Amino acid sequence: MPRSSRSPGDPGALLEDVAHNPRPRRIAQRGRNTSRMAEDTSPNMNDNILLPVRNNDQALGLTQCMLGCVSWFTCFACSLRTQAQQVLFNTCRCKLLCQKLMEKTGILLLCAFGFWMFSIHLPSKMKVWQDDSINGPLQSLRLYQEKVRHHSGEIQDLRGSMNQLIAKLQEMEAMSDEQKMAQKIMKMIHGDYIEKPDFALKSIGASIDFEHTSVTYNHEKAHSYWNWIQLWNYAQPPDVILEPNVTPGNCWAFEGDRGQVTIQLAQKVYLSNLTLQHIPKTISLSGSLDTAPKDFVIYGMEGSPKEEVFLGAFQFQPENIIQMFPLQNQPARAFSAVKVKISSNWGNPGFTCLYRVRVHGSVAPPREQPHQNPYPKRD
């Protein structure tokens, strides 16, 4: 609505403003109610006490207008205060927001600057570190790889050698029992397992005393027994037992199961042991060992006429083809001859075979002599 052209001090203008403003209107209504109450109470008071009353309507209206203006100004000030507070509050929030935004922006800029500086100086430092810290270990690693390659070649060579040895062992395991036995027999035939000097060896001067030795068995049966081709009368002399050649048929045979042989030693010897050797059953032409000697007695002989000294009685087991017998009686004297007297064999009534006889002892007298156990002389 357009404003009226009334002056500010006009009471009508004030009333009009009061009509448009609700709060001054309420104040004016209160003023009217107060005037009415005064009018209502005035008759009662006039009834009791009659005083002179002066009505001033113009002053009352002016007061009401002033009160309405004050109320209006108060409301306007309150609204201005509220709006000012809101504006100030919003301004503070904006300031805080701007401050935080600036702080975060500064931090981001600082981080970006630091990263830029780090990226500029890092490559050179990384290069130096690689030169100092990586090249050394890399060189060591290359040397280690070369050593590993070298040792790998050696390992391959060793593995090849091991494979060859394994193949040979497998071949040896695949050999039959007969081959193993034959090899063992050949070793026993050609090898000397008695590591003692043999004073009955023909090659060093030992011989046979034929005067005190049994007659050699000479018969057609022996010829057919040992040789299939009958070209000559087959018989080996007694001194064959003084040679190391122990092969089937290369033995001295005497008739029956009783006989003797006297061996003249190469020199006088303090006797300690005697060894008998026979062929194994596996290579015997007859397939048996019935011609091997069984029970026998050993005598030491010295002087002329020769005196016999009993040295021991023994039994030969043909399963053990080489047997060494320690003498039961070892007198403290040296002997120049040894007699081996056989009293039985292992079942052959026709003849007995001796393959090899060895005599062991020492040239010097032994330090300690065992207790002598002399036996009566035997023919």
UniProtKB/Swiss-Prot annotation:
UniProt PTM comment: Highly glycosylated in the Golgi apparatus during spermiogenesis.
Entry keyword Chloroplast: no
Coiled-coil blocks: 141-182
Domain of life: Eukaryota
PROSITE patterns for this protein: SUN
Domain SUN: 205-364
Effect annotated for changing M162K: In SPGF16; uncertain significance; in mouse model increases interaction with DNAJB13; impaired localization to nuclear inner membrane
Residue ranges, compositional bias (Polar residues): 31-45
Nuclear face of the membrane: 1-105
Clinical note on disease: Spermatogenic failure 16: An infertility disorder caused by spermatogenesis defects and characterized by abnormally shaped spermatozoa in the semen of affected individuals. Most spermatozoa are made up of headless tails, while a small proportion has an abnormal head-tail junction. A few spermatozoa are made up of tailless heads.
The name this protein goes by in its record: SUN domain-containing protein 5
Organism of this sequence: Homo sapiens (Human)
